[in-house]
Amino acid sequence: MKNFVKAAIAFSFLFLFQMHAQAQKLRAKDMVVTAHGWYGTDMERTRPNLKTYGYTTYEASVGFQTNPNDSSAYARQFGYPMLNFGFSLARMGEFKFYDQTKFSDLYSLYGSFERSLLRKKRLSLGYLLDFGATYNPNRYDPVNNPGNNWLSSPVMAYFGAGAFIKFHVGRRWEIGADAMFRHYSNGRLALPNEALNALGAGLFARYRLDDYDYKEYTGIPRIKADYKRGMQYMIVLGGGVHTCMAEWNAKVETEDDATKKSGIKLKAHPKLSISVDALYRYALRYASGVSLDVFYSSNMKELEASDRIVYGDEAVEKCPGYSPISVGLALVHEVYWHNLAVHVAVGAYPYRHKGVNGVEAKEAGDRERGWHYEKAGLRYYFPKLGDTFLGFAIKSHSVKAEYLEFSAGVRI
């Protein structure tokens, strides 16, 4: 499990650095330095032991501003985005509890993509996306910290998305404000994992080393886009590991107090998938289409046994059954930055037999039996290797993670 987490983090930063390297040739004069303060609140308002919901975050980042002098057609069509690499300190140790639960501060390394959608004199409006990894030193412990059932892993994934407004104060300085959604989770590598979702707002100040005047980002001749328009097909193999919420619920009901206090042990089950994607590339940045997905789950015997404990024999006998195979159909969209793609999919299952129905399971905190699913992740294409690619994504149900999937495939 530890090696799997390390591989996930290594994959994340491989993609981030590839994105940066392809943006433009790195030069000190294109650098920007940013300091950011942010205040957020936990979106989940039903945690019984939590007394206060707010916390502060402090961030520092170094980035590179793409510009019309030396950037590619991708940079032009994205409006000359900024690519940042930073460190954040989320002061979740500020949470106060009604019991003895303890939270610690979270430490994150991340990459950020910042794009201006509107530039008007000194004003810029746009959006930003963060991807990174987080270290959590004070996690769930059945003996010393049983109330922290949100974050149970030492290393987690971090994702952020938001909108910003900024003002150019002179040639080199910027000040601004943003509103962001932030998500911390281990991708169901371990339980309990209620995860943490937060909303908040912040202020930032930025110093630019580049000499390119912000007033000159409009009225620039269009750079010819070199891409292959038309249909493209992908064959994808994927896999990951998963801890099952139904098994957790069953053990909570059946284990004695001594076992619960010493820690409930869960097996991590392999998950496999094969997909065939058909996408139409209609712009340099975008391709959309459909995907046929076949998923394999290896824990059907354990799932049935757990359902008999949680829901009873009668509910299990009435259910459609327990098949390790599920078939999904999904709408797919990819957004490209050179050979890097953000890959998202929203799908439904025409065939899926996972025991008791989704409504009953969802009431028990198990959302993975629903009729629809989502995927969001990154792919990196290797044109010189026959258009093969590597990728990873979070597969989820109702935005609740099922597992972290690594994938490899070929585009034909």
Specify the residue positions occupied by each region the protein language model found:
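Residues on the lipid-exposed face of transmembrane beta-strands in outer-membrane beta-barrel proteins
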Residues: 35, 60-66, 109-115, 129-133, ...
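Transmembrane beta-strands of outer-membrane beta-barrel pores
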Residues: 37-43, 66, 87-93, 131-137, ...
